[in-house]
From Swiss-Prot:
InterPro entries according to UniProt: Nucleotide-bd_a/b_plait_sf, Ribosomal_uL23-like, Ribosomal_uL23/eL15/eS24_sf
Protein name: Large ribosomal subunit protein uL23
Gene Ontology CC annotations of this record: ribonucleoprotein complex; ribosome
Family designation: Belongs to the universal ribosomal protein uL23 family.
Lineage: Bacteria, Pseudomonadati, Pseudomonadota, Alphaproteobacteria, Rickettsiales
Keyword annotations: Ribonucleoprotein, Ribosomal protein, RNA-binding, rRNA-binding
NCBIfam families xref list: PRK05738.2-4
Gene Ontology biological process terms in this record: translation
Length: 98
């Protein structure tokens, strides 16, 4: 699979206080395409970030019900991946920011 296809699998990294604290354990969190599988995510992260992936955990997040001007609607469903890297590898999210 080409590298451009891998970019379609990974939507964006999740950078919060909680995900920053688990990054010390070599775990990184991403929103991913809802059709992505564990093996394809592993290959995509290894190709894009040039790291060795140990394990991938996936969570399906159901959209919340919200009310806007009296009309009840729902937010979109999402898929989240928690990627565990090998011991000496890490991902620098802000590597290109100056």
């Amino acid at each position: 699979m080409s590298v451009y296809k891998y970019y379609d699998l990974i939507r964006k990294p999740i950078i919060t206080e909680k995900t920053t604290s688990i990054s010390e354990q070599n775990k990184y969190t991403f929103y991913v395409n809802k059709f992505a599988k564990k093996l394809s995510l592993k290959r995509a992260i290894e190709a894009i970030f040039k790291v060795k992936v140990k394990k991938v955990n996936i969570l399906n997040i159901k959209g919340k019900k919200k009310r806007f001007k009296g009309i009840i609607g729902t937010q979109i469903n999402r898929k989240k991946a928690i990627v565990t890297l090998e011991k000496d590898h890490n991902i620098d999210y802000a590597g290109g920011i100056k």
